[in-house]
């Protein structure tokens, strides 16, 4: 169905060309000039072609996304994903993909916002679990309220997390900005802005249930 189709920046390009395009786009992201260590590091990376992001971001290497039993992961996504996320879309994005994403605004078509408000009222935060393994990947909001988290996510089209909202035990960032789980789940990308690292994440990648329940 159209609503579950993937978004590609330039669908007519070959995979190799697309990879180059995405890498180039992320390397050339504009960052406001400010006298802080974050912007100094990002600016230096852009000038000298280095691929690293400042702490607390934890870097990983390509071996994380090496072929496994099910694409880049050992298992398919869970059957009963949260927020009525589509299984087929989730499995393709999580396990057989490095560049595609759910379409912008997809997360608002699910039951996420309604259920997130309830969870936030009860617990003061929302847990986001790996759609494959059920391991915790993000906890939000932190350092802001739910409305601020939703507003930022709405403005970018995808759930958007900050450094303090990442469970770094289970998440890594690759040199091209790709955000992945330590088990090989494609999550999205790190797209730094003037506030710091911003992790633009597919909802279908973090719609798992704890421990695969």
Which residues fall in each region the model found?
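Generic hydrophobic secondary-structure signal
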Residues: 1, 26, 30-32, 187, ...
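N-terminal chloroplast transit peptides
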Residues: 1-30
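Low-complexity, intrinsically disordered regions enriched in charged/polar residues
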Residues: 7, 15, 35-36, 41, ...
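Intrinsically disordered, low-complexity coil segments
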Residues: 17-19, 37, 116-120
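N-terminal, immediately post-signal peptide pro-regions of secreted/luminal proteins
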Residues: 28-46
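Flexible coil/turn and secondary-structure edge motifs
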Residues: 41-213
């Amino acid at each position: 169905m159209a609503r579950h189709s993937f978004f590609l920046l330039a669908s007519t390009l070959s995979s190799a060309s697309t990879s180059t395009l995405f890498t180039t786009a992320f390397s050339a992201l504009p960052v406001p000039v400010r006298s802080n260590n974050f912007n100094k590091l990002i600016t230096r990376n852009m000038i000298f072609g280095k691929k690293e992001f400042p702490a607390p971001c934890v870097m990983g290497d390509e071996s994380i996304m090496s072929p496994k039993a099910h694409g880049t992961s050992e298992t398919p996504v869970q059957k009963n994903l949260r927020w009525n996320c589509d299984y087929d879309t989730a499995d393709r994005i999580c396990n057989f993909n490095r560049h595609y994403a759910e379409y912008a605004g997809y997360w608002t078509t699910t039951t996420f916002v309604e259920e997130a408000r309830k969870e936030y009222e009860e617990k003061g935060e929302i847990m986001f679990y790996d759609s494959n393994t059920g391991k915790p990947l993000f906890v939000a909001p932190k350092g802001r309220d739910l409305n601020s988290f939703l507003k930022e996510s709405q403005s970018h089209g995808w759930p958007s997390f900050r450094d303090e909202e990442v469970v770094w035990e289970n998440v890594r960032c690759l040199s091209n900005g790709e955000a992945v789980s330590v088990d090989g789940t494609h999550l999205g990308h790190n797209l730094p802005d003037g506030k710091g690292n911003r992790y633009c994440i597919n909802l279908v990648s973090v719609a798992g249930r704890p421990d695969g329940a």
